[in-house]
């Protein structure tokens, strides 16, 4: 749905999949690479089982808090250090979490442009078992799906990141 370079090098006349299901209410909430230059990607952690994390005390002990993974190069560029609170935003909303600066999130070279990835684990819900406010990652994700299966696309989307 959203392109970190604003185009599709393999098919320049088509940026978005013509086979996706795009609801009218979503059309004005599509991010651009100028406003949201980084790619957010969601994933689960070993300690998580679906969304049980927020209500099972043992899982909250193992993984107590939402975090964001960013690469060393992007962290340096943004002045973000390990443990800093960061705000990650998309055209649809924003979340706050602690930053984890890592070598795992390396920048990509796409059509001659450096594109940074931001890892955003799916974590808990609005309030965890200890009563702390949490943020829902799906606040950032687009509401679009595959035209045949209606499976939503929550995996990648455009974001920006800044110190909170």
Which residues does each predicted region cover?
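Long, low-complexity segments enriched in small/aliphatic residues
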Residues: 1-55
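Long, contiguous, secondary-structure-rich segments that constitute the structural scaffold
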Residues: 3, 7-8, 35, 51-164
